Swiss-Prot record:
PROSITE patterns with a match to the protein in the record: AA_TRNA_LIGASE_II (PS50862)
Cofactor(s) this protein requires: Mg(2+)
Entry's cofactor comment: Binds 2 magnesium ions per tetramer.
Catalysed reactions, as listed in the record: tRNA(Phe) + L-phenylalanine + ATP = L-phenylalanyl-tRNA(Phe) + AMP + diphosphate + H(+)
Lineage, highest ranks first: Bacteria, Pseudomonadati, Pseudomonadota, Betaproteobacteria, Burkholderiales
Enzyme class: ligase
InterPro entries: aa-tRNA-synth_II, aa-tRNA-synth_II/BPL/LPL, Phe-tRNA-synth_IIc_asu, Phe-tRNA_ligase_II_N, Phe_tRNA_ligase_alpha1_bac, Phenylalanyl-tRNA_Synthase, tRNA-bd_arm
First and last residue of the signal peptide: none
Quaternary structure and interacting proteins, as annotated: Tetramer of two alpha and two beta subunits.
Residues engaged in binding Mg(2+): 279
EC number, UniProt record: 6.1.1.20
Stated name of the protein: Phenylalanine--tRNA ligase alpha subunit
Organism for this UniProt entry: Variovorax paradoxus (strain S110)
GO cellular component terms listed in the entry, alphabetical order: cytoplasm
Amino acid sequence: MNELDSLVATARAAFAEAKTPAELENAKAQFLGKSGRITELMKGMAALSVDEKKSRGAAINVAKQAIEAALTERRQQLADEELSLQLRAEALDVSLPGRRRIPGGLHPVSRTLERIEEIFSSMGFDVADGPEIESDWHSFTSLNNPPNHPARSMQDTFYVDLNGDDGIPYNLRPHTSPMQVRYAHQHIKKYAAEFAAAAADATGTVKAPEIRVIAPGRTYRVDSDATHSPMFHQCEGLWLGENVSFKDLKVVFTDFCRTFFESDDLVLRFRPSFFPFTEPSAEIDIQFASGPLAGRWLEVAGSGQVHPNVVRNMGLDPERYIGFAFGMGPDRLTMLRYGVNDLRLFFDGDLRFLSQFQ
Protein backbone atom coordinates (compact mmCIF):
# COMPACT_ATOMS: atom_id res chain seq x y z
CA MET A 1 0.00 0.00 0.00
CA ASN A 2 1.52 3.32 -1.06
CA GLU A 3 1.46 6.54 0.91
CA LEU A 4 -1.76 7.91 -0.61
CA ASP A 5 -3.69 4.66 -0.17
CA SER A 6 -2.57 4.59 3.45
CA LEU A 7 -3.72 8.20 3.89
CA VAL A 8 -7.17 7.39 2.51
CA ALA A 9 -7.47 4.37 4.81
CA THR A 10 -6.40 6.46 7.80
CA ALA A 11 -8.98 9.14 6.94
CA ARG A 12 -11.76 6.55 6.62
CA ALA A 13 -10.84 5.11 10.01
CA ALA A 14 -10.82 8.57 11.61
CA PHE A 15 -14.20 9.41 10.09
CA ALA A 16 -15.66 6.12 11.28
CA GLU A 17 -14.56 6.84 14.86
CA ALA A 18 -16.39 10.21 14.86
CA LYS A 19 -19.62 9.79 16.85
CA THR A 20 -21.03 13.30 16.36
CA PRO A 21 -21.06 15.88 13.55
CA ALA A 22 -18.65 18.04 15.61
CA GLU A 23 -16.13 15.19 15.94
CA LEU A 24 -16.46 14.52 12.22
CA GLU A 25 -15.61 18.14 11.41
CA ASN A 26 -12.50 17.92 13.58
CA ALA A 27 -11.42 14.78 11.74
CA LYS A 28 -12.05 16.47 8.41
CA ALA A 29 -9.71 19.33 9.36
CA GLN A 30 -6.87 16.82 9.86
CA PHE A 31 -7.06 15.71 6.25
CA LEU A 32 -8.82 18.41 4.20
CA GLY A 33 -8.23 21.57 6.25
CA LYS A 34 -5.82 24.41 5.49
CA SER A 35 -3.15 22.64 7.53
CA GLY A 36 -4.36 19.14 6.72
CA ARG A 37 -2.49 16.21 5.22
CA ILE A 38 -3.71 16.81 1.66
CA THR A 39 -2.65 20.47 1.80
CA GLU A 40 0.81 19.46 3.03
CA LEU A 41 1.17 16.98 0.16
CA MET A 42 0.20 19.65 -2.35
CA LYS A 43 2.79 22.04 -0.89
CA GLY A 44 5.44 19.29 -1.14
CA MET A 45 5.23 19.27 -4.95
CA ALA A 46 7.06 22.59 -5.24
CA ALA A 47 10.45 20.94 -5.84
CA LEU A 48 9.18 18.44 -8.44
CA SER A 49 9.57 18.74 -12.18
CA VAL A 50 6.65 19.61 -14.42
CA ASP A 51 5.99 15.98 -15.39
CA GLU A 52 6.35 14.80 -11.80
CA LYS A 53 3.95 17.54 -10.61
CA LYS A 54 1.37 16.42 -13.15
CA SER A 55 1.59 12.78 -12.14
CA ARG A 56 1.81 13.50 -8.41
CA GLY A 57 -1.00 16.06 -8.48
CA ALA A 58 -3.34 13.65 -10.23
CA ALA A 59 -2.65 10.96 -7.63
CA ILE A 60 -3.20 13.39 -4.75
CA ASN A 61 -6.54 14.55 -6.29
CA VAL A 62 -7.70 10.93 -6.52
CA ALA A 63 -6.86 10.47 -2.84
CA LYS A 64 -8.59 13.76 -1.96
CA GLN A 65 -11.76 12.71 -3.80
CA ALA A 66 -11.74 9.37 -1.99
CA ILE A 67 -11.40 11.14 1.39
CA GLU A 68 -14.24 13.58 0.49
CA ALA A 69 -16.43 10.65 -0.54
CA ALA A 70 -15.72 8.93 2.77
CA LEU A 71 -16.53 12.18 4.60
CA THR A 72 -19.87 12.59 2.76
CA GLU A 73 -20.77 8.97 3.46
CA ARG A 74 -20.06 9.36 7.20
CA ARG A 75 -22.04 12.60 7.36
CA GLN A 76 -25.05 10.84 5.90
CA GLN A 77 -24.63 7.97 8.35
CA LEU A 78 -24.57 10.35 11.31
CA ALA A 79 -27.65 12.20 9.97
CA ASP A 80 -29.50 8.91 9.55
CA GLU A 81 -28.57 7.84 13.08
CA GLU A 82 -29.80 11.17 14.50
CA LEU A 83 -33.09 10.90 12.61
CA SER A 84 -33.55 7.34 13.80
CA LEU A 85 -33.03 8.41 17.42
CA GLN A 86 -35.50 11.25 17.00
CA LEU A 87 -38.13 9.00 15.47
CA ARG A 88 -37.72 6.49 18.28
CA ALA A 89 -38.07 9.27 20.86
CA GLU A 90 -41.24 10.59 19.21
CA ALA A 91 -42.73 7.23 18.39
CA LEU A 92 -46.35 6.64 19.36
CA ASP A 93 -47.27 3.52 21.24
CA VAL A 94 -50.44 2.58 19.38
CA SER A 95 -51.21 -0.03 22.01
CA LEU A 96 -51.81 2.68 24.63
CA PRO A 97 -55.48 3.58 25.23
CA GLY A 98 -56.42 6.96 23.78
CA ARG A 99 -57.30 9.99 25.86
CA ARG A 100 -61.02 10.64 25.86
CA ARG A 101 -62.02 13.98 24.39
CA ILE A 102 -65.15 15.30 26.05
CA PRO A 103 -67.13 17.57 23.72
CA GLY A 104 -67.96 20.97 25.16
CA GLY A 105 -71.35 22.61 25.20
CA LEU A 106 -73.40 25.49 26.52
CA HIS A 107 -73.95 25.85 30.25
CA PRO A 108 -77.57 24.99 31.16
CA VAL A 109 -78.20 28.56 32.36
CA SER A 110 -76.80 29.87 29.05
CA ARG A 111 -79.21 27.56 27.24
CA THR A 112 -82.07 29.00 29.28
CA LEU A 113 -81.02 32.59 28.52
CA GLU A 114 -80.82 31.80 24.80
CA ARG A 115 -84.27 30.20 24.93
CA ILE A 116 -85.73 33.22 26.75
CA GLU A 117 -84.25 35.60 24.17
CA GLU A 118 -85.54 33.50 21.27
CA ILE A 119 -89.08 33.37 22.65
CA PHE A 120 -89.35 37.08 23.41
CA SER A 121 -87.65 38.04 20.14
CA SER A 122 -90.39 36.12 18.35
CA MET A 123 -92.89 38.37 20.19
CA GLY A 124 -91.19 41.53 18.92
CA PHE A 125 -89.04 42.35 21.95
CA ASP A 126 -85.52 43.75 21.62
CA VAL A 127 -82.69 42.44 23.83
CA ALA A 128 -80.91 45.14 25.87
CA ASP A 129 -77.39 45.14 27.25
CA GLY A 130 -75.70 47.33 29.84
CA PRO A 131 -72.93 47.71 32.44
CA GLU A 132 -72.78 45.47 35.50
CA ILE A 133 -71.33 48.29 37.64
CA GLU A 134 -74.07 50.89 37.96
CA SER A 135 -74.75 54.27 39.51
CA ASP A 136 -77.10 54.70 42.45
CA TRP A 137 -79.50 56.66 40.25
CA HIS A 138 -79.86 53.91 37.65
CA SER A 139 -80.08 51.08 40.22
CA PHE A 140 -82.43 52.74 42.70
CA THR A 141 -83.55 56.36 42.28
CA SER A 142 -84.81 56.00 38.71
CA LEU A 143 -86.83 52.96 39.81
CA ASN A 144 -88.71 54.81 42.55
CA ASN A 145 -86.66 53.27 45.37
CA PRO A 146 -86.56 55.81 48.24
CA PRO A 147 -83.25 56.60 49.99
CA ASN A 148 -84.16 54.50 53.04
CA HIS A 149 -85.18 51.41 51.04
CA PRO A 150 -83.64 48.17 52.47
CA ALA A 151 -82.21 47.26 49.06
CA ARG A 152 -79.75 50.14 49.39
CA SER A 153 -78.18 48.71 52.55
CA MET A 154 -74.73 47.12 52.63
CA GLN A 155 -76.40 43.87 53.74
CA ASP A 156 -78.20 43.47 50.42
CA THR A 157 -76.10 45.23 47.76
CA PHE A 158 -72.43 45.03 46.80
CA TYR A 159 -70.85 48.48 46.59
CA VAL A 160 -67.68 49.48 44.71
CA ASP A 161 -64.95 51.62 46.25
CA LEU A 162 -65.60 54.41 43.75
CA ASN A 163 -68.11 57.24 43.97
CA GLY A 164 -70.32 58.45 41.16
CA ASP A 165 -71.01 62.06 40.21
CA ASP A 166 -73.63 62.21 42.99
CA GLY A 167 -71.03 61.25 45.61
CA ILE A 168 -72.67 57.86 46.19
CA PRO A 169 -70.60 54.70 45.57
CA TYR A 170 -71.22 52.68 42.45
CA ASN A 171 -72.77 49.25 42.95
CA LEU A 172 -72.84 45.85 41.32
CA ARG A 173 -76.30 46.02 39.81
CA PRO A 174 -78.79 44.13 42.03
CA HIS A 175 -81.20 43.72 39.11
CA THR A 176 -81.24 44.33 35.35
CA SER A 177 -83.79 47.15 35.58
CA PRO A 178 -81.09 49.81 34.92
CA MET A 179 -80.68 48.31 31.45
CA GLN A 180 -84.34 49.08 30.77
CA VAL A 181 -83.92 52.69 31.86
CA ARG A 182 -80.85 53.09 29.65
CA TYR A 183 -82.63 51.41 26.73
CA ALA A 184 -85.65 53.72 27.14
CA HIS A 185 -83.41 56.80 27.00
CA GLN A 186 -81.64 55.48 23.90
CA HIS A 187 -84.98 54.59 22.28
CA ILE A 188 -86.42 58.06 22.88
CA LYS A 189 -83.23 59.68 21.54
CA LYS A 190 -83.26 57.44 18.47
CA TYR A 191 -86.88 58.27 17.67
CA ALA A 192 -86.83 61.87 18.92
CA ALA A 193 -88.64 63.17 15.82
CA GLU A 194 -91.41 60.58 16.13
CA PHE A 195 -91.93 61.31 19.84
CA ALA A 196 -91.99 65.06 19.15
CA ALA A 197 -94.57 64.56 16.40
CA ALA A 198 -96.71 62.39 18.67
CA ALA A 199 -96.54 65.00 21.45
CA ALA A 200 -97.57 67.78 19.06
CA ASP A 201 -100.49 65.82 17.60
CA ALA A 202 -103.75 66.83 19.26
CA THR A 203 -105.79 64.10 17.55
CA GLY A 204 -103.85 61.24 19.09
CA THR A 205 -103.44 59.49 15.74
CA VAL A 206 -99.66 59.94 15.54
CA LYS A 207 -97.90 57.24 17.53
CA ALA A 208 -94.25 56.96 18.51
CA PRO A 209 -92.58 53.52 18.36
CA GLU A 210 -93.35 51.53 21.50
CA ILE A 211 -90.64 50.44 23.91
CA ARG A 212 -90.63 46.67 23.96
CA VAL A 213 -87.49 45.12 25.44
CA ILE A 214 -86.10 42.40 27.68
CA ALA A 215 -82.94 42.83 29.76
CA PRO A 216 -81.17 39.55 30.59
CA GLY A 217 -77.87 39.49 32.45
CA ARG A 218 -75.85 38.85 35.59
CA THR A 219 -76.85 40.52 38.85
CA TYR A 220 -75.37 40.57 42.35
CA ARG A 221 -76.76 40.48 45.88
CA VAL A 222 -75.42 39.57 49.31
CA ASP A 223 -77.14 36.19 49.50
CA SER A 224 -76.02 32.56 49.31
CA ASP A 225 -77.90 29.33 50.01
CA ALA A 226 -79.36 26.37 48.12
CA THR A 227 -81.67 28.60 46.09
CA HIS A 228 -79.67 31.85 46.05
CA SER A 229 -76.22 32.82 44.83
CA PRO A 230 -74.23 36.09 45.28
CA MET A 231 -74.09 36.19 41.48
CA PHE A 232 -77.25 35.16 39.68
CA HIS A 233 -79.02 35.83 36.43
CA GLN A 234 -82.11 37.91 35.93
CA CYS A 235 -84.27 38.78 32.98
CA GLU A 236 -86.60 41.74 33.11
CA GLY A 237 -89.08 42.85 30.50
CA LEU A 238 -90.65 46.20 29.65
CA TRP A 239 -93.44 47.21 27.30
CA LEU A 240 -94.40 50.90 27.19
CA GLY A 241 -96.86 52.49 24.83
CA GLU A 242 -100.08 54.48 24.77
CA ASN A 243 -102.47 51.54 24.96
CA VAL A 244 -100.63 48.81 26.87
CA SER A 245 -102.61 47.23 29.68
CA PHE A 246 -102.29 44.60 32.41
CA LYS A 247 -104.16 42.27 30.09
CA ASP A 248 -101.23 42.44 27.67
CA LEU A 249 -98.90 41.45 30.50
CA LYS A 250 -100.98 38.36 31.26
CA VAL A 251 -101.10 37.33 27.61
CA VAL A 252 -97.38 37.86 26.98
CA PHE A 253 -96.12 36.12 30.11
CA THR A 254 -98.57 33.24 29.85
CA ASP A 255 -97.51 32.61 26.26
CA PHE A 256 -93.87 32.78 27.30
CA CYS A 257 -94.23 30.27 30.14
CA ARG A 258 -96.23 27.81 28.06
CA THR A 259 -93.67 28.01 25.26
CA PHE A 260 -90.68 27.76 27.60
CA PHE A 261 -92.01 24.75 29.50
CA GLU A 262 -93.59 23.28 26.34
CA SER A 263 -96.97 22.89 28.00
CA ASP A 264 -100.11 24.42 26.52
CA ASP A 265 -102.02 23.47 29.67
CA LEU A 266 -99.70 25.27 32.11
CA VAL A 267 -101.75 27.24 34.65
CA LEU A 268 -100.56 30.65 35.90
CA ARG A 269 -101.94 32.99 38.53
CA PHE A 270 -101.21 36.65 39.17
CA ARG A 271 -101.16 37.29 42.91
CA PRO A 272 -101.31 40.89 44.29
CA SER A 273 -98.00 42.10 45.67
CA PHE A 274 -95.93 45.26 46.07
CA PHE A 275 -92.88 46.62 44.25
CA PRO A 276 -91.80 50.27 44.38
CA PHE A 277 -91.36 50.44 40.60
CA THR A 278 -94.80 49.06 39.62
CA GLU A 279 -98.36 49.87 40.68
CA PRO A 280 -100.40 47.70 40.76
CA SER A 281 -97.97 44.82 41.24
CA ALA A 282 -98.33 41.06 41.09
CA GLU A 283 -96.33 37.92 41.77
CA ILE A 284 -96.64 35.35 39.00
CA ASP A 285 -96.98 31.71 40.07
CA ILE A 286 -97.15 28.52 38.05
CA GLN A 287 -98.96 25.38 39.16
CA PHE A 288 -97.40 21.93 39.20
CA ALA A 289 -99.55 19.65 37.06
CA SER A 290 -98.09 16.30 38.17
CA GLY A 291 -95.67 14.63 40.54
CA PRO A 292 -95.48 14.92 44.33
CA LEU A 293 -96.07 18.70 44.12
CA ALA A 294 -99.15 18.44 41.89
CA GLY A 295 -101.60 21.26 42.58
CA ARG A 296 -99.07 23.41 44.44
CA TRP A 297 -97.95 26.85 43.26
CA LEU A 298 -94.43 28.20 42.74
CA GLU A 299 -93.46 31.83 42.26
CA VAL A 300 -91.50 32.40 39.02
CA ALA A 301 -91.68 36.18 38.46
CA GLY A 302 -92.69 39.58 39.72
CA SER A 303 -94.63 42.01 37.57
CA GLY A 304 -96.87 45.03 37.42
CA GLN A 305 -97.88 48.23 35.70
CA VAL A 306 -94.89 50.60 35.50
CA HIS A 307 -95.07 53.28 38.20
CA PRO A 308 -95.63 56.83 36.84
CA ASN A 309 -92.41 58.02 38.53
CA VAL A 310 -90.42 55.37 36.66
CA VAL A 311 -92.08 56.33 33.37
CA ARG A 312 -91.17 59.94 34.06
CA ASN A 313 -87.56 59.01 34.88
CA MET A 314 -87.37 57.20 31.56
CA GLY A 315 -88.15 60.50 29.84
CA LEU A 316 -91.83 59.96 28.99
CA ASP A 317 -95.09 61.56 30.07
CA PRO A 318 -96.89 59.12 32.43
CA GLU A 319 -100.19 60.78 31.52
CA ARG A 320 -99.75 59.49 27.97
CA TYR A 321 -97.51 56.44 28.19
CA ILE A 322 -98.33 53.36 30.20
CA GLY A 323 -97.06 49.82 30.25
CA PHE A 324 -95.97 46.81 32.23
CA ALA A 325 -92.75 45.29 33.49
CA PHE A 326 -91.78 41.87 34.77
CA GLY A 327 -88.72 40.23 36.23
CA MET A 328 -87.77 36.57 36.52
CA GLY A 329 -84.79 34.43 37.45
CA PRO A 330 -83.41 32.31 34.59
CA ASP A 331 -81.48 30.30 37.20
CA ARG A 332 -84.71 29.24 38.87
CA LEU A 333 -86.31 28.48 35.51
CA THR A 334 -83.29 26.28 34.73
CA MET A 335 -83.73 24.45 38.05
CA LEU A 336 -87.39 23.84 37.25
CA ARG A 337 -86.75 22.75 33.68
CA TYR A 338 -84.08 20.22 34.62
CA GLY A 339 -85.31 19.19 38.07
CA VAL A 340 -82.27 20.49 40.01
CA ASN A 341 -82.81 21.34 43.68
CA ASP A 342 -79.58 23.22 44.51
CA LEU A 343 -78.73 26.36 42.54
CA ARG A 344 -75.07 26.21 43.60
CA LEU A 345 -74.52 23.07 41.51
CA PHE A 346 -74.73 25.18 38.35
CA PHE A 347 -71.77 27.34 39.41
CA ASP A 348 -69.45 24.81 41.10
CA GLY A 349 -67.78 23.99 37.77
CA ASP A 350 -68.17 20.22 38.22
CA LEU A 351 -68.04 18.75 34.71
CA ARG A 352 -69.61 15.52 35.94
CA PHE A 353 -72.74 17.51 36.72
CA LEU A 354 -72.67 19.95 33.80
CA SER A 355 -72.00 17.25 31.17
CA GLN A 356 -75.45 15.80 31.86
CA PHE A 357 -77.00 18.75 30.05
CA GLN A 358 -74.99 18.47 26.80
